[in-house]
Amino acid sequence: MQINRRLATALLMLILILQGCATLKPDRQTEAQLLPEIREKIDLLLTNESFEAAAALLQTVAQQSESPLREQLYLEAAETWLKAGYMENSLSLIDKLQPPTSDDPAFAFRLRMLRTEIAILRGDIEQALDLMEPSPGEETPIPLRLRYHANMAEIFRLSGNLLESARELNVMDLLLADDEVQRLEIQELLVQTLASMTDTALQLLQPPPPSNMGGWMELARLVKQQIAQPADLATALATWRERFSDHPALQAFLASLLERRGLSSSDHIAILLPQSGPYKNVATAVRDGFMAAWYQHPLEYRPQLRFYDSSKLEDTLRTYQQALLQGAQMVVGPLNKNAVNMLLQMETMQQPVLALNQVEDKTLYHPNLFQFGLAPEDEAEQIAERAWLEGHQQALILTPAGGWGDRIAENFRLRWQTLGGAVLEQRQYNASENDFSHPIRQLLNIDESQARIRALEQLLGKKLESEFRRRQDADFIFLAARPQKGRQLRPQLRFHHAGSLPIYTTSHIYSGVKDDEKDRDLGRISFVDTPWLLEDETQNNLSRTNLQRLMPGVGGQYARLYAMGIDSYNLLASLQQLQAQPGRTISGKTGTLYLDRYNRLHRLLAWADMKAGSASITGYAPRMQTPTFGQPTQSESALPNTPNGGQTQFLDQATKP
């Protein structure tokens, strides 16, 4: 089975790259058994990232070699198969590998790290932690220690322990010493990891100077503040350097923070939102979130805002042109999906647009238009990825009848099957009803069990004392439901003997309002959601807790849209950066944000569990590669430069060799 390349998280890709550093050459006597031209060919394939070909060659040469070279080459082949995405090939070699000699600790350590990395890929964090013991000593070569700490960083991150993940990255940074290129990548990932923590957590846990971690945490807080003016950020960084004068942060890294902030600034922003019609309340929530973020900037640095009514679809292009004539340097909106589609058809777009929705056709593209929305499709795909990482293979799908349920089910199914998972059964329920026993029985094959028992009773001519059984081949249920229906569906699934099946669902299951009594029936459900909704922090002026005092609506059904409004404002200074640097992410209220090659913004969300009626964060979605959907409708020359033949990978800079 080949691992889909999108399954590689940023840190795990870093681990695989570090294998190249940690693949220690055999001693001279062992190396002499391998012809120089063969070693040269293997190294060339590895340098060119032709991992599949390199792994096949290594395995072939190993089969023709004698011990101890045979074992060394088999191990390198197993590592390279995993780089190529072929876990089963790697495992088949691991199972027959033993250290060629008892006095080769490096071989045994590499084998243990490889087993760990496979456990991480499978989502078996407990096994991965067991394999990490014992930790390497000072005598262990630095490349192997780097690999160990990269593994630990990923294990902690997937467990939701971002601070400990950052500590491991800090150790890696110190171990790299004079390798400035790799240190820049590690430092970027370190600050991004800390920036995903809440402001409250950063402030409470930050140690004072001269602590290295304290310095990184303060830098992360500066990054999160979204300081608008480069001069102000330069002053803040200078003050930071005075406080942490011996901190290992590279000057090149600090300079990169300044460069990003200076990439884009607009003094005049036009906001296109409907002021009447069915989307008025949605628009109001987005607008209020946008304004809340705008008010956080000092008065002298706030851009001019001008609002335009976009209620009438037919006026979309005229309103855009009117905004430009009145001096707009950036346009935010429209909200209507059809209006976004109209703008995408424009041949010339003089000023950039941050649209507040995403069109159905994922390949429609304009280099000056960015699409941002709370797409349930992103959630469905991340659920598929999480379930796969946790080792599940057989899925059941239960969604409401209608367009919304169809779209979510289809996106989950496509992503799940792309990863290699199987959909055993897919059923729909009528959301206007309260009794869902019929679709549930079909989903769980209980209706077939009933039919078999009735047929047997007819054959025997007597009533049988038997219990209907649900199917036993399913690993989990993917469920899409609004809060009220979710509270009805979960007990009914339990009644039909599915209480032990894990249930994964989208954010729609959670109202966003803490209600232990009503949500008690949602026990043992895992879902993805906006971090801002789940994190209870008081130190940040833009936290939900603080904004709710000023805007009561923040606590209602449109809460996630306030977060979207905040991110919409803060994104404006980062769009060019995200476009120019594929793989870059920024920490937002709606999640960790990144841009794909079609200028569609994606969100990496928080994972939460419902226990005793209360939602609590358990971790964060893995940083996957950016999805690609074929060629854009615009000419290829209009696309931003991307690696790998234009296929933008959603990998942090730390993953680049």
Features from the language model and the residues they span:
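Bacterial Sec signal peptide processing site at the extreme N-terminus
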Residues: 18-37
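Beta-alpha junction/loop-to-helix N-cap segments that form part of ligand/metal-binding clefts
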Residues: 106, 281-286, 296, 300-362
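Extended repeat-based interaction scaffolds and adjacent low-complexity, acidic/S/T/P-biased segments
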Residues: 147, 159, 163-265, 324
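Extracytoplasmic ligand/sensor domains, especially the bilobed periplasmic-binding protein
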Residues: 330-428
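Extracellular/periplasmic periplasmic-binding protein-like sensory domains
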Residues: 449-451, 472-474, 490-566
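Solvent-exposed, acidic/polar segments of extracytosolic/periplasmic ligand-binding ectodomains
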Residues: 516-517, 589-657
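Segments of small-molecule ligand-sensing domains
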Residues: 546-617
